[in-house]
């Protein structure tokens, strides 16, 4: 053990080694390694010394040295206290001291008040104070630094019992107008505010009211007053600077191109339906916007693949993939070229093929604003179109391998012939969609009519119109369109509205009025009839892509000055009237269904 102890070197020189009795001597060799000390090493020691001063508790003192209290002393003390309360001078002196203490001295200091007799704390150090006194601006700031203006009392003092209406009535009296009737309350309701313009409006939106009384807090209202206070409509209304004549929306029917704007029971005169060229009204009706009456219709004319303007656009098929609900609230968009002229009597008119429900949107803004180059006068356009089509395909159909290819010229010529024959019957039932297996297939069941369906541009729904026959959307299932008196009534799921003055203005369709002039008579003399034959899609595609081949030229010479009739699905068009049925039986019976026609080949053929 002695040898082991001599080998140990304490960490601190001159300090005796502390041996732990709980450790064995064999562990001394590992003391230089870190280890966990035992609890006995850091145990605090208690000192046995007594405190310097000792005090007995109250209970201990009472038990050690008890004191006897005499009853006379208690009675004498009570008598003294009773006499002291009756002394008025002493009581007044005490109350005066109490009032002086609470009135002249602040018990709870307020940061808004300046205390008297209390020196202001220095805001700056000694060096800063010297600089302030040297500068004249600093001296002014030093004087004003300890002052503050705080309002602690109201200008109007109210007594305990007061009449609030009498005191505050002249300051908070609402300005009442003369016409506070039920009519104004109904017109200013939330339902009416939804259709009002929040910014401002013209005088056509509301009837003239009496001028309000002027008051001290009178604020001049806007033109609509209460009616145009809040704009709660989710659809942005047109501002009065943009629409000087067209007011707000109304549910009143259209009467001869004029609309009577009404708000509740407040009536107002009718105004013409016109809008500036820079802004178009939003579409709230299932029937599309009338492009014929708006001034911007002359500048913005969209191109649609009609028989006249089929070759004017090259991006028609891609436009159908867009969302039909991008513009406006109506799923129906009518995009046609509008050609109008004076109509004599019951002159026939023709509608172009159009697509529903997809809207046709050009890709560029320049094409929308600029008029198409293919629009001409009806006489010059038709004559030049017939001339071009006759030069391309002089025959009514081309025979190749036993399958005919029908020329669009024949369709145009026969359309004029049938327009004269079908004038007396102007009623067409609702168009039904055709279920197809492929994207560009023709319907299987066919019936002989006088129209050509553009199935390649319709994606399953084929519509056509000629003479006075109209085509409506499949959404309006209960629509009946009498076209004799130029009036239609449409129930499209939103509401029922009656439109007059012109059929084509109601649906925005392309309308071409034609006169019985010498040009039509010349076309009728050149036209001949012959039977309908099947159209082969393969032969049609090959023949259209190679119009200059010898076989094409040979076949066109055989079928010169002939006219073909087309076959349509019986479920797509339903002609009512004995005259139409008799003409169908006279011209030809039901033929075999035509085959698939490629849209690219047809567009290339017409170009």
From Swiss-Prot:
GO cellular component, one term: nucleus
GO terms (BP aspect): cell division; regulation of mitotic nuclear division; regulation of mitotic spindle organization; regulation of protein localization
Alphabetic keyword roster: Cell cycle, Cell division, Mitosis
Region called Disordered, residue ranges: 362-381, 584-607
Gene Ontology molecular function terms on file: protein kinase binding
The organism's place on the tree of life at top rank: Eukaryota
Family indicated by similarity: Belongs to the BORA family.
Function: Required for the activation of aurka at the onset of mitosis.
The protein's name: Protein aurora borealis
């Amino acid at each position: 053990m002695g040898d082991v102890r001599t080998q140990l070197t304490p960490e601190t020189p001159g300090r005796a080694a502390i041996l732990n009795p709980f450790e064995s001597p064999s562990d001394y060799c590992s003391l230089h390694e870190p280890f966990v000390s035992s609890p006995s090493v850091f145990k605090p020691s208690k000192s046995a010394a007594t405190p310097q001063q000792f005090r007995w508790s109250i209970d201990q003192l009472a038990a050690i040295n008890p004191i006897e209290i005499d009853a006379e002393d208690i009675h004498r003390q009570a008598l003294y206290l009773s006499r002291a309360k009756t002394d008025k001078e002493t009581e007044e002196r005490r109350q005066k001291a109490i009032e002086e203490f609470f009135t002249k001295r602040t018990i709870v200091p307020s940061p808004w008040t300046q205390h008297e007799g209390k020196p202001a704390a220095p805001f700056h150090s000694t060096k800063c104070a010297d600089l302030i006194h040297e500068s004249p601006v600093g001296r002014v700031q030093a004087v004003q630094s300890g002052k503050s203006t705080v309002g602690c009392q109201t200008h109007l003092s109210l007594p305990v019992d007061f009449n609030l209406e009498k005191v505050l009535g002249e300051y908070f009296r609402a300005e009442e107008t003369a016409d506070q009737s039920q009519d104004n309350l109904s017109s200013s309701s939330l339902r009416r505010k939804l259709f009002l313009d929040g910014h401002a409006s013209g005088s056509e939106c509301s009837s003239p009211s009496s001028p309000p009384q002027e008051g001290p807090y009178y604020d001049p209202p806007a033109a609509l007053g209460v009616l145009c206070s809040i704009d709660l409509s989710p659809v942005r209304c047109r501002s009065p600077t943009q629409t000087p004549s067209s007011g707000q929306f109304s549910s009143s029917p259209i009467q001869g191109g004029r609309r009577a704007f009404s708000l509740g029971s407040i009536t107002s005169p009718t105004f013409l339906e016109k809008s500036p060229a820079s802004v178009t009204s939003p579409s709230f009706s299932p029937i599309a916007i009338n492009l014929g009456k708006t001034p911007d219709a002359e500048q913005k004319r969209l191109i649609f693949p009609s028989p006249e303007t089929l070759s004017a656009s090259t991006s028609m098929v891609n436009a159908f993939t867009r969302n039909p609900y991008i513009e406006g609230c109506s799923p129906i968009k009518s995009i046609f070229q509008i050609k109008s002229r004076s109509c004599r009597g019951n002159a026939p008119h023709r509608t172009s093929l159009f697509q529903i429900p997809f809207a046709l949107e050009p890709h560029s803004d320049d094409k929308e604003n600029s008029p198409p180059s293919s629009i001409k006068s009806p006489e010059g356009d038709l004559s030049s179109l017939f001339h071009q089509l006759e030069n391309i395909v002089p025959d009514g159909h081309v025979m190749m391998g036993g399958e005919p290819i029908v020329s669009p010229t024949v369709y145009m010529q026969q359309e004029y012939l049938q327009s004269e024959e079908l004038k007396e019957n102007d009623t067409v039932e609702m168009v039904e969609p055709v279920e197809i297996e492929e994207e560009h297939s023709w319907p299987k069941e066919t019936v002989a009519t006088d129209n050509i369906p553009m199935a390649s541009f319709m994606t399953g729904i084929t519509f056509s119109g000629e003479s006075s026959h109209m085509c409506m959307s499949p959404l309006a299932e209960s629509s009946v369109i009498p076209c004799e008196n130029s009036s239609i009534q449409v129930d499209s799921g939103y509401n029922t509205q009656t439109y007059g003055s012109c059929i084509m203005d109601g649906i925005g369709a392309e309308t071409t009025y034609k006169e019985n002039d010498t040009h039509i008579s010349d076309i009728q003399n050149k036209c001949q009839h012959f039977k309908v034959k099947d159209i082969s899609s393969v032969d049609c595609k090959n023949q259209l892509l190679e119009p200059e081949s010898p076989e094409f030229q040979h076949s066109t010479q055989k079928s010169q000055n002939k006219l073909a009739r087309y076959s349509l699905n019986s479920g797509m068009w339903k002609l009512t009237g004995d005259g139409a049925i008799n003409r169908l039986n006279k011209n030809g019976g039901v033929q075999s269904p035509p085959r698939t026609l490629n849209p690219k080949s047809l567009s290339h053929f017409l170009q």
